[in-house]
Amino acid sequence: MILIEDLQTTEAGNRWANALKLLTVYGLRPVELTCLHVKQTPKGKKYLFCSYQKRSGRGLTKPRELEPLPIDGTDWKLLSLFEAGLLELPKLSAEGNGVAEQIRKYLERRSAWISLKAKVAARNEELGIYSFRHSYSVRGHRAGIDSGSMANAMGHSLDVHNSEYPYSTNETTQSAFDRARNLSVIT
């Protein structure tokens, strides 16, 4: 949140902050910023849709409905702003690794990003462009969303999710079993 707030001091900074908000709230790959659309269910519920299809050795990922996971309840009204054409984004090139590279280059010149990277490095952790996407996975699991649902929301298979987004630790395993035991006592 501090990083996003720090960027919002200029028009260009606002556009980049909007991109980071989308990456974080919807768990997007950077390139997916160029493939967003608003759609509507038959019952009239509007949602953000990603038409991107990632090619891999396992085939193509499917376009998908995006599920927001706000940070501390803050969703920045991204869907309504996007639909109204009021969510300005930087000009992004979807060629190759262009979007991720553009975001990386922009952030590497920002003092808030440099400071945040140093704090993360002091904990022997890494901070990169995909950290916004990774935080989506962590928030989802902490909220009790199962791995299969998180994988589907993020546009990859359960196998990929489990290998690339290992969430389970001794602490999370203990919490999961504590919750299960508490549920069985209630029912």
Q: For each predicted feature, which ranges?
A:
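Conserved tyrosine-mediated DNA breakage-rejoining catalytic core shared by Y-recombinases
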Residues: 35-77
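Active-site/catalytic core of tyrosine-dependent DNA strand-transfer enzymes
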Residues: 68-132, 136
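Catalytic-site neighborhood detector that most strongly recognizes the C-terminal catalytic loop/helix
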Residues: 52-56, 154-179
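Basic, Lys/Arg- and aromatic-enriched nucleic-acid-binding interface segment
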Residues: 1-30, 34
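Short, polar N-cap/turn motifs at the start of nucleic acid-interacting alpha helices
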Residues: 39-47, 145-164
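C-terminal catalytic core of tyrosine-transesterase DNA break-rejoin enzymes
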Residues: 21, 25, 32, 130-156
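Intrinsically disordered, low-complexity basic tails/linkers immediately adjacent to helix-turn-helix/homeobox/MYB/SANT
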Residues: 179-187
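Extended hydrophobic-aromatic, low-complexity segments
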Residues: 59-61, 78-81, 130, 147-152, ...
